[in-house]
Every structure is written in C-alpha cells, then in structure tokens.
A protein has these predicted regions:
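Acidic, proline/glycine-rich low-complexity IDRs
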Residues: 1-197
Length: 197
C-alpha cells in the first residue's frame, strides 16, 4: 500500500512543479484511533497565490459503500482531497482535511464530486466554515497499475452552515453558480457566505 501512496505523492508533486511550485511540500501527519495515518501536504508558491493542502492516505484502500453486500478490495474507487486557501495556514485546517480523508475508512463514506462532507464544527480556529463541498480539481487522476482503479483528487471547498443547507436543498451546482453571481472567491478564508436567491 505504501507504493500506492508513493505514486500518488509523486504525481501530485509533479502537478505542482508544472505549475511553478517547485519546493518540497511541508507535511503534517494526523492519526485517528483505529485508522491509518493521514498526511496533509502543503504546497505554497510565491506571492499571493492560493496554498494547496493535499491529503495522502485516503487512497491507500479503495472506498467501499457500507450498503454493498460484497466489496471489491481491488477495483473500488480511490480518492484524495485538496483544499486551496489564500493567506497564512490556519491552525486546525490540516486536521479537518485529514478527517475528510479518513472518513471512507472510519465511517464508510464514499468521496465523490458534489458530495457534502459536514464536520459540524469550525474547519479551523475561528472559521465560519463547518463543511466541505467536494468537486473535481485540476489535478489529474493518478493512474495505478492494473487492476487498481485510478486515484481521483477532489477539490474540497470550505462552506458555511447556511451554504451547506443550500447545497442540501438545491444541489452543488446551484451553490457554485451562486458563488459566481455573488463574486465569491472560494479560496478566500475571510470571504462572506454566498446569499443565493
């Protein structure tokens, strides 16, 4: 399994090198009782660009829907998550990223685009955001040797409790459209919540 994580780490690093972030990432490790370690890699470029926090460990095993009678231990979907935020690293964010990445192993959650992962607590110290909205990221899928499924790196956008309620009511795409209409920058940790009509 460590080989899988090594491949994922290398491919993610290649993505950021191509985008001008050549420094080795800082890494924080988080371990939850009864679960394997989750690393959170921090890729920071020069200037006022968003810092990317990428999980490493979720893709160690394929995700399994707990309602399935028979789970495929090889070909099930695999994922990692990436959070992009501007500014200094907020205290507690790495733990929240690790909570999402550990959710498939701990809670049987299958991470997928448009999924809402509600932690019901601030994602970092003093944050108004309590949930993540998952979507496709610009990081390419990491192809693994056959017969293993590729690893999808999903974007995880911090959202407020009000926005989470909106996603439950209207859907993920409606939330994204509201951000565009309201001129909301989802990478701004001090942004206001969108006010969908």
């Amino acid at each position: 399994m460590s080989d899988i994580l090594g491949v994922v780490r290398a491919r993610v690093r290649e993505h950021f090198v191509r985008n001008g972030i050549t420094a080795e990432p800082d890494t924080a490790s988080v371990t939850f009782l009864g679960a394997d370690r989750i690393d959170v890699m921090r890729f920071a470029g020069p200037g006022d660009v968003a810092v990317h926090y990428v999980s490493l460990g979720c893709s160690r095993y394929p995700m399994v829907d707990p309602t399935e009678m028979v789970a495929d231990p090889v070909q099930g979907p695999r994922a990692e998550v990436v959070v992009a935020l501007r500014g200094p690293s907020p205290a507690g964010l790495s733990r929240s990223v690790a909570v999402v990445a550990a959710a498939p192993a701990v809670e049987g959650l299958v991470l997928a685009p448009d999924a809402l992962v509600d932690l019901e607590m601030p994602l970092w110290e003093g944050a108004p955001f309590t949930a993540f909205l998952l979507g496709r990221s610009d990081i390419e899928d990491v192809v693994l040797p056959d017969p293993l499924s590729p690893v999808v790196v999903l974007s995880a956008v911090p959202i407020t409790a009000t926005e989470a309620a909106w996603v439950r009511l209207k859907g993920a795409e409606a939330m994204r459209e509201a951000w565009v209409q309201d001129g909301v920058d989802p990478t701004d940790p001090r942004r206001r919540a969108a006010s969908p009509s």
